[in-house]
Each structure stands twice: as structure tokens, then as C-alpha cells.
């Protein structure tokens, strides 16, 4: 009798195992969801872009944006380019 049962179990194992595993998985999923409870809603944080915009707005609030350097003043402080090394300095 046992060899017949083992042969039947071996033959029909995929048809028996999948529904059993499905039921066990579904019960475990529902049990875990019940034990954990409903998840708390996370507090919405500002994105990196929004933080950057807020920071730049705070920085520009105290400055007069109409007072900018002219191009000539900016050029005085630029570093010398590699190709300009052999040129003579203006004195």
C-alpha cells in the first residue's frame, strides 16, 4: 500500500504542492499584515530641488541683485589660460 501512495504522491506532487503553498503564503501574508497593522503615513519632506530653491531664495533676500560686476571687472579676476603663458604682460 505504501508504494502505491508514494507513487501517487510523486506523480501528483505539483498539483498538490502549488495550492498548498499558495494557501500557506496567503495566510502568512494576511497574518503578517494583521500583526504589523496599518503603516503610518511618512511625513512629506522637501525634495532636494525645493531645498535648493529655498536656500537660494534666502541667500538672495539680503542682497541687492541689481549691483553686479561688469565684464571688465570679472575678467581681471579670471585665471590665466594655458595658451596665454607666452604672451607678454601689459604694463
UniProtKB/Swiss-Prot annotation:
The chain crosses the membrane at residues 12-34. It is a single-pass membrane protein. Keywords: Membrane, Transmembrane, Transmembrane helix. The keyword Magnesium does not apply. It is found in: Membrane. GO terms for cellular component: membrane. Pfam families: UPF0767. It comes from the Eukaryota. Belongs to the SMIM12 family. PANTHER family: SMALL INTEGRAL MEMBRANE PROTEIN 12 (PTHR28599:SF1). This is Small integral membrane protein 12. It comes from Xenopus tropicalis. The lineage of its organism: Eukaryota, Metazoa, Chordata, Craniata, Vertebrata.
